[in-house]
């Protein structure tokens, strides 16, 4: 096992900068997830750690060793890709031991490691099968096993579940989490799926256009996003945003005017906030309230109702801003499309973002953070 540090790491192809001044500390045994939209540079960052991409400037350390000029095979890292990349003519055992065989390992060592890893990944009964006889989830476990038998210090996973169907992705997510707890290895995992990030990570790194937008624990990013990008990316359905204007400030409070002219005091940091400033109020669909238990409400026309059984999602068009807000409530809510529907805004669950997108720190203490 080993820690990983990136110091001012930049990657550029000509004039195109895909990763800019990345600074990260990944602790020994930590499970870290790089998450962000397509093209944000998360896979490039992983490939630089693996040695598959050169670093334009900056320094990469694994343990105490600077790795910039160290070949991939000597870095002590193992990588699992989106594609299983299994040899179809080899058995599961032969696929898992292939790297060790190329490295000249003794047959007894190969057999011992393959059998140990097969037990961990529940593949022992499949060792003689060929890849074509395996399910997608089993093939992915073989790909993970092939990396594990090499006993890397750092385990890199580049969107390993993207080729699986929804049910298998949930199953493999659980298995990867259990595997990390059992092995205690340093793992760095790349995904565009924020559900995978929230459920797997000890620490999440949110990337936006080649820069680190925020680093933190899952619930920290959910409850206290650093900017509007993180707020909109983490959470599903995404956070609702409303244009507001600042009408007053006080110590640790900001009053804003909503599109329907109602005013609401928000418990957020007020330092640097100017009266008259245009800002954005954010609130998650699951934090909106029924109108009968809220002091501040918004009213609109129901556009779409999504009944999911365990919850209902209602898309409401607010006339003053001509955009839909999403309201999410547990259980079944019976409402017709076209009906008038009112929702409430609890001040303590609201977020406030400046014009540059940066957040005014929320002061309400959330559980688990």
Curated annotation (Swiss-Prot):
One of its GO terms (cellular component) is maltose transport complex. Signal peptide: none annotated. Belongs to the ABC transporter superfamily. Maltooligosaccharide importer (TC 3.A.1.1.1) family. ATP binds at residues 36-43. Residues 4-234 form the ABC transporter domain. Keywords: ATP-binding, Cell inner membrane, Cell membrane, Membrane, Nucleotide-binding, Sugar transport, Translocase, Transport. PROSITE patterns: ABC_TRANSPORTER_1, ABC_TRANSPORTER_2, MALK. It is an enzyme of class 7 (translocase). The keyword Isomerase does not apply. GO terms for molecular function: ABC-type maltose transporter activity; ATP binding; ATP hydrolysis activity. Its main location: membrane. It comes from the Bacteria. SUPFAM superfamilies: MOP-like, P-loop containing nucleoside triphosphate hydrolases. Gene3D superfamilies: 2.40.50.100, Nucleic acid-binding proteins, P-loop containing nucleotide triphosphate hydrolases. The complex is composed of two ATP-binding proteins (MalK), two transmembrane proteins (MalG and MalK) and a solute-binding protein (MalE). This is Maltose/maltodextrin import ATP-binding protein MalK. It is found in: Cell inner membrane. Its EC number is 7.5.2.1. Part of the ABC transporter complex MalEFGK involved in maltose/maltodextrin import. Responsible for energy coupling to the transport system. The keyword Repeat does not apply. Pfam families: ABC_tran, TOBE_2. It is a peripheral membrane protein. It catalyses: D-maltose(out) + ATP + H2O = D-maltose(in) + ADP + phosphate + H(+).
């Amino acid at each position: 096992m080993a820690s990983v540090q990136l110091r001012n790491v930049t990657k550029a192809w000509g004039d195109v900068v895909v990763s800019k001044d990345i600074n990260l500390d990944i602790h020994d045994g930590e499970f870290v997830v790089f998450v962000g939209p397509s093209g944000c540079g998360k896979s490039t960052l992983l490939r630089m750690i693996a040695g598959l991409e050169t670093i334009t400037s900056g320094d990469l350390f694994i343990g105490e060793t600077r790795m910039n000029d160290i070949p991939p095979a000597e870095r002590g890292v193992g990588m699992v890709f989106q594609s299983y990349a299994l040899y179809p003519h080899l058995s599961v055992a032969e696929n898992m031991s292939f790297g060790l065989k190329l490295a000249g390992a003794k047959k007894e060592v190969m057999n011992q490691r393959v059998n140990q890893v097969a037990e961990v990944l529940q593949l022992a009964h499949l060792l003689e099968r060929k890849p074509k006889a395996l399910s997608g989830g089993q093939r992915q476990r073989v790909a993970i096993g092939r990396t594990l038998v090499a006993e890397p210090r750092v385990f890199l996973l580049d969107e390993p579940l993207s080729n699986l169907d929804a049910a298998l992705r949930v199953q493999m997510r659980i298995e990867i989490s259990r595997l990390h707890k059992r092995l205690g290895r340093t793992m760095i995992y790349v995904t565009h799926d924020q559900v995978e990030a929230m459920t797997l990570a000890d620490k999440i790194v949110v990337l936006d256009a080649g820069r680190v937008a925020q680093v933190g624990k899952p619930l920290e990013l959910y409850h206290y996003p650093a900017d509007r990008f993180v707020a909109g990316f983490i959470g599903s359905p995404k956070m609702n945003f409303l244009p507001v204007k600042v009408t007053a400030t006080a110590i640790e409070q900001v009053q804003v005017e909503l599109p329907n002219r109602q005013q609401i005091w928000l418990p957020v940091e007020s330092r640097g906030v100017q009266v008259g400033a245009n800002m954005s109020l954010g609130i998650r669909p699951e934090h909106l309230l029924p109108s009968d238990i809220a002091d501040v409400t918004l009213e609109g026309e129901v556009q779409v109702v999504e009944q999911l059984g365990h919850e209902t999602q209602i898309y409401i068009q607010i006339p003053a801003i001509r955009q839909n807000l999403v309201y999410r409530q547990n259980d079944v809510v019976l409402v017709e499309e076209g009906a008038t529907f009112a929702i409430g805004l609890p001040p303590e669950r609201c977020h406030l973002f400046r014009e540059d997108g940066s957040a005014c720190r929320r002061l309400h203490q959330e559980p688990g953070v």
